[in-house]
Curated annotation (Swiss-Prot):
Highest taxon above the source species: Bacteria
Upper classification of the organism: Bacteria, Pseudomonadati, Pseudomonadota, Alphaproteobacteria, Hyphomicrobiales
Region listing for Disordered, in residue ranges: 37-57
Keyword list, A-Z: Nodulation, Plasmid
Keyword Zinc attached: no
Protein name (database record): Nodulation protein NolB
Induction, per UniProt: By flavonoid signal compounds.
UniProt-listed Pfam families: NolB
Source organism: Rhizobium fredii (Sinorhizobium fredii)
UniProt function note: Regulates cultivar-specific nodulation of soybean.
Length: 164
């Protein structure tokens, strides 16, 4: 069975002329809209938000501790008062006129403040942490299974009660 096919070359000028005409019409409308926007902005005063001056904040080296980076950022935000590192009694002090840069380490008394609470010191910290996370994961999995089981039982009991 043969189907009549219209030649592409015969129909192309008709299709192209209408699409080119639409494109030209669109471009004219776009140009008119741009001109009217220019006229509107020229007649009304331009309102711009005030731009704050850029702050001189430098990124700390990735090897510096987090506390030093935080103190440097705070010091850059408040250049009049430099924030010093916390003393062993955990109180931070503001120093006026201190040189900028990372905080200096305070002398530590023997055995005072050298260990963190709840975190064992030594090379086995990572292994202990992984074991703790594994136990936590197992506990959460058990709770999820019990919760799903109770939900299934509750659903079954509700169906039985509805059926009578």
């Amino acid at each position: 069975m043969m189907l009549p096919v219209t030649s592409i070359s015969n129909s192309l000028p008709r299709v192209a002329s209408s699409s080119f005409g639409e494109q030209a019409q669109f471009e004219r409308a776009l140009a008119q809209a741009a001109d009217s926007m220019k006229n509107d902005t020229a007649s009304t005063p331009v309102r711009t938000a005030p731009i704050s001056p850029p702050m001189d904040v430098h990124r700390a080296a990735p090897t510096s501790p987090l506390k030093d980076r935080v103190l440097q950022t705070i010091s850059a935000i408040c250049p009049d008062s430099i924030v010093a590192a916390a003393a062993p009694n955990h109180k931070a002090a503001l120093i006026s006129g201190a040189p900028p840069g990372p905080s200096q380490k305070l002398p530590v008394e023997d055995g005072a403040g050298t260990e963190r609470l709840g975190i064992p010191q030594g090379g086995h910290d990572f292994d202990v942490m992984v074991a703790g996370l594994r136990d936590l994961y197992n506990g959460v999995t058990q709770v999820a299974l019990v919760s799903k089981g109770i939900s299934g039982i509750t659903s079954s009991v509700n169906k039985l009660l509805k059926e009578g």
